[in-house]
Amino acid sequence: PYTTLFRSVTSADSASTLQAWDAIVELTGANGVRRVPIQKFYIKAGQVDIKPDEIQTAILIPKESYENCFGNYFKYAMRNAMDIATTGCSVNVRLSADKKTMERVRIGFGVAGPVPMRAVKAEAGAAGKPVTMAAVEEIAASVLEDINPRDSWRASKALRQHIAVELTKRCLMKSIELAGGVL
């Protein structure tokens, strides 16, 4: 993912998943090793926090982001010949021991703003919600408060918003299923 990750390409498939899994980018340069949380790595469209003498030496996933966590990624592309995501969504979920409550939800997006991003308001609202279809639909609808997709020749803002809600719903449903929850 070097070219898409380091050019701050919002449509990069890996970028939304790295957001949802709280990745840390490890950079090594003349001054040693530096670790940057993925949420701070993307500065603006086309710009990331890497110094001219640095190279990426690792992408780290914190234990709390994978232990007892399950995730899924869906991408919507307009056609197979142009595999660039119109919108991409990745969800990482941790359920309670009885599988009836969402303890932690992380939602990452590509092409929902100028840089890959998290739906932090939706995530905060998801914590403690019951594992129900109504809760999934509520969380999915709430991502509209976090994202800011643009109009482009590939898709309108309205279409991207619609897709983001639907992809969140599908990713959350699949992640809950993978975690052992029943909707």
Report residues per predicted region.
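C-terminal structural segment of proteins
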Residues: 1-183
